[in-house]
């Protein structure tokens, strides 16, 4: 790609139609994506003598090529722009760091509907309630619903293969529709309807119906049933008393913004059916010299318009900032949703109070983030001084976790100049080594991580190896043998070993596998950042190992039983609804599983009991 960009010749070929443009540097990397109602007019503005900002000057100085894509409408250009931003992640665009789809509560369309958490495309038949700000909020709500309305939450594979009710039925958190005769179709359908009304924000209707049923049961002298319904009423009231509810019953997203010291926080409040489902703070990646208007406009566009987000659009969006393209945004969102979406920047009444709440939350979150960054910057600066490096802009740390050599998992965590970069944390399943050989595990993960091409901006300044001299020797050996296109001599390899008592503050650091290490004072900021990244790596490895161990735990106790191979194990677990159900089953119930004889059922029963 040419290093010299002929702007005059390029502009002669550009159309005045709407479209999207992509700017490339000399290395062929997309550095900026933009849209325009008039491509020629917009692109010409980059090559004037008096540019608007230093950011634009720096961008233009790097341009080696510009590609344009003409679109039929400005709305189409807006949608394409944000899809390109998501695809290329250009360094001069404002970037939304968190692009995970939001979770919903899913009420299936089965004969006996189930409740579950759902992310992604909504292909399954049923109803979706949300979005919720995170998975924790969904799980908390599902646990609450299970206590109040005992609708099943088990997978269909478990539900269809049960011959006896599970533990959830025994503790009163499921009506047991899997077993005939435990609950009538009418009663189960009634509880499902309560769930539907409750999630739709119609608490008053739920209470009205429950009170009527309680009074009817009482008049019929069915006092146990009346007492059970009374408990449901009290539970619903306790929940609704805690909720911040709007009288309007509207669906709103409320977006507050705070901007300070080159950092932005966008706080989104999710309101559905008049209830605040939750909120979340975002810290978009903001290139230096970017104005607040561009931050807000780009964030809102990426938040709602990027194709894979699977975001459910509310009827109205309240914004804490006046947008130049408010009409275009509203039209694009309406086209995407297939219904009218209103974008409001100057609300009154309750809506103004919502916006004030979002603004306050954004400011509070930004203040906290800036304080945390100040601390991490000081610690990284102190570490750079100790290690005699100009700066530490990126660190990576590795740890190994296993139980007696089984289910070995290696973790890699990444810190940049702002601290933990969790989107880049990775786990590696280690295979093909002698069980318990941590050195071989470290050797394998380092080769997998670094034995390939790496972007220049992702080459770490420091690689921290948890485990001391032996593990550091493995790292040195791996790097000596690497044949890669990037500078393998750039990262500083640093080993860290805990003291004999494994207490924080007694760590020994090693530059080389031979000789003596050195220790830092317990109050050293450099030591604190080392402890931080090492603990993150340790936790990440352990959580990955536990997940892997839990995955095989359900089958491990069956693997030792003669005559029970993989297919029979799968059939047993599927038919009995998991290992817990199998452990509770009688010989007769086990013998009903297809492919299991009475003799084998006895063997399975006694093996699990003893």
From Swiss-Prot:
The UvrABC repair system catalyzes the recognition and processing of DNA lesions. UvrC both incises the 5' and 3' sides of the lesion. The N-terminal half is responsible for the 3' incision and the C-terminal half is responsible for the 5' incision. InterPro entries: GIY-YIG_endonuc, GIY-YIG_endonuc_sf, GIY-YIG_UvrC_Cho, Hlx-hairpin-Hlx_DNA-bd_motif, RuvA_2-like, UVR_dom, UVR_dom_sf, UvrABC_protein_C. Residues 540-559 are annotated as: Disordered. Coiled coil: none annotated. Interacts with UvrB in an incision complex. One of its GO terms (biological process) is SOS response. The gene is uvrC. Pfam families: GIY-YIG, HHH_5, UVR, UvrC_RNaseH, UvrC_RNaseH_dom. This is UvrABC system protein C. It comes from Klebsiella pneumoniae (strain 342). The lineage of its organism: Bacteria, Pseudomonadati, Pseudomonadota, Gammaproteobacteria, Enterobacterales. The keyword DNA damage applies. Residues 16-94 form the GIY-YIG domain. SMART domains: GIYc, HhH1.
């Amino acid at each position: 790609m040419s290093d010299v960009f002929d702007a005059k010749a390029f502009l002669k070929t550009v159309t005045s139609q709407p479209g999207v443009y992509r700017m490339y540097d000399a290395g062929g990397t997309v550095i900026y994506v933009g849209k325009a109602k008039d491509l020629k007019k917009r692109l010409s503005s980059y090559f004037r003598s008096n540019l608007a900002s230093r950011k634009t000057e720096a961008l233009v100085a790097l341009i080696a090529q510009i590609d344009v894509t003409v679109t039929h409408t400005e709305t189409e250009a807006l949608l394409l722009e944000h899809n390109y931003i998501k695809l290329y992640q250009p360094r001069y665009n404002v970037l939304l760091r968190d692009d995970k789809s939001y979770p919903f509560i899913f009420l299936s369309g089965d004969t006996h509907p189930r409740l579950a958490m759902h992310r992604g495309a909504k292909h399954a038949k049923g109803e979706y309630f949300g979005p919720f700000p995170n998975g924790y909020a969904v799980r908390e709500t599902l646990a609450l619903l299970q206590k109040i309305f005992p609708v099943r939450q088990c997978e269909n594979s478990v539900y269809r293969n049960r011959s006896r009710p599970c533990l959830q039925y025994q503790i009163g958190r499921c009506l047991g529709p899997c077993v005939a005769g435990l609950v009538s179709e009418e009663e189960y359908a009634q509880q499902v309807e309560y769930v539907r009304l409750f999630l739709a924000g119609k608490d008053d209707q739920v209470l009205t119906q429950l009170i009527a049923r309680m009074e009817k049961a009482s008049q019929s002298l069915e006092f146990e049933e009346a007492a059970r319904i009374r408990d449901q009423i009290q539970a619903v009231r306790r929940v609704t008393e805690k909720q911040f509810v709007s009288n309007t019953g509207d669906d709103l997203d409320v977006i507050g913004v705070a901007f300070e010291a080159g950092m932005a926080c966008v706080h989104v409040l999710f309101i559905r059916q008049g209830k605040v489902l939750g909120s979340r703070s975002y810290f978009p990646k903001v290139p230096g010299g970017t104005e607040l208007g561009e931050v807000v406009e780009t964030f809102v566009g990426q938040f709602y318009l990027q194709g894979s987000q699977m975001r459910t659009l509310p009827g109205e969006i309240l914004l804490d900032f006046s947008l130049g393209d408010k009409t275009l945004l509203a039209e694009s969102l309406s086209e995407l949703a297939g219904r009218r979406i209103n974008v409001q920047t100057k609300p009154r009444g309750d809506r103004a109070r919502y916006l004030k709440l979002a603004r306050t939350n954004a400011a509070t979150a930004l203040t906290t983030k800036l304080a945390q960054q100040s601390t991490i910057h000081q610690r990284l600066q102190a570490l750079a001084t100790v290690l005699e490096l100009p700066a530490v802009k990126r660190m990576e740390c590795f740890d190994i976790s296993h139980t007696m050599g089984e289910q070995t998992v290696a973790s890699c965590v990444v810190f940049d100049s702002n601290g933990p970069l969790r989107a880049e944390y990775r786990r590696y399943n280690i295979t093909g080594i002698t069980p318990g050989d941590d050195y071989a595990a470290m050797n394998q993960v380092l080769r997998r991580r670094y034995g390939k091409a790496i972007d220049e901006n992702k080459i770490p300044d420091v690689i921290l190896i948890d485990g001391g001299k032996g593990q550091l020797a493995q790292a040195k050996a791996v790097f000596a043998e690497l044949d890669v296109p990037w500078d393998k001599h750039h990262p500083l390899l640093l080993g860290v070993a805990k003291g004999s008592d494994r207490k924080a503050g007694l760590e020994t650091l090693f530059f080389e596998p031979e000789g003596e290490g050195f220790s830092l004072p317990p109050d050293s900021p450099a030591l604190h950042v080392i402890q931080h990244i090492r603990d993150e790596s340790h936790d990440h490895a352990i959580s990955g190992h536990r997940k892997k161990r839990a995955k095989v735990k359900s089958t491990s106790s069956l693997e030792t039983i003669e005559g029970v191979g993989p297919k029979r194990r799968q059939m047993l677990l599927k038919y009995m609804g998991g290992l817990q159900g199998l452990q509770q089953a009688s010989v007769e119930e086990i013998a009903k599983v297809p492919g299991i004889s009475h003799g084998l059922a006895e063997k399975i029963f006694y093996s699990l009991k003893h």
